Amino acid sequence: MTVQTFNPDKVLVSEKKDGSFTKQMTDIIMKDVAENSVVMQLGQYHEMDGLQEKTVYVQTDGVSAYWVNETEKIKTDKPEVVPVSLKAHKLGIILVASREALNYTWQKFFEDMKPQIVEAFHTKIDEAGLLGHETPFANSVAKSAKDSSQVVVGPINYENLLKLEDKLYEADINPNAFVSKIQNRSALRESRDGDKKTIYDKATNTIDGITTVDLKSKQFKKGDLLTGDFNSLIYGVPYNINFKISEEGQISTMKNSDGTPINLFEQEMVAIRVTMDIAVMVTKANAFAKLTASAENV
């Protein structure tokens, strides 16, 4: 018996309204997501071999506490390799398109929707893994900083940037990256020592010589910075990306200009729900620190 495979060049969207993207389509999306996601740029990738949960191994330093699964933390008294359970959770996004899309081949529809899918996923991954916003994960970079009491409250200036780094140095952590946002650059340029030398190099986008990556997210407030050892941030992706097309119902998370929810049938639109499983985990408990302008953002 011949197994029928999904050929996106020949199958119309109306003929296949749910299923999984082909491996090639998933690879294309994940390549673009990885190039834009801060978690994926700075974190350490682990192959999950198609498993929802996978044991990976982490080298400890004999001083710090380490998360070995989502709820259990251990502390070792000497450097050793410990098993860590990396568990994937589902992240979903919803996008809308004209009902005309039902007449497209899946290949054309995929090419049209790919930029939106990529942007939505890398934003979702970063907000969950870095900020802990609407996250299925047990920990995040920001939560790690808060739980370790490694938060500096105050404006971006030379003194506070040094205090931020000192939080990590006191824990014997060498930061290898900062996460900032473009709106912070003017404050960073004005962060100068007594000799009027700036700690920020705009030509290389580095703070105190350390790589700085800008996060584009409304959830990451102006004046906030994250820093730490991003080798302690690990992630994995076990499966292909899944999709489901809907033609009826309301999209409560999306609004028309008048504030009413989008009604797919009445407005002749379709919605595509795209889901992926991804694991994101902070392994070293005190690996990160945060600078925030407001105590409300701690």
Tell me what each language-model feature is:
Residues Q24-V38, F109-M113, I117-A120, K124-I125, ...:
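Short, Φ-rich (hydrophobic/aromatic) sequence segments
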Residues Q59-T60, A97-R99, I182, V274-M276:
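Residues immediately flanking
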Residues G92-A171, K290-L291, N297-V298:
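Alpha-helical scaffold segments that mediate packing/assembly in large oligomeric complexes
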Residues V151-F265, V270, M276, V298:
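Extended oligomerization regions of viral-like shell subunits
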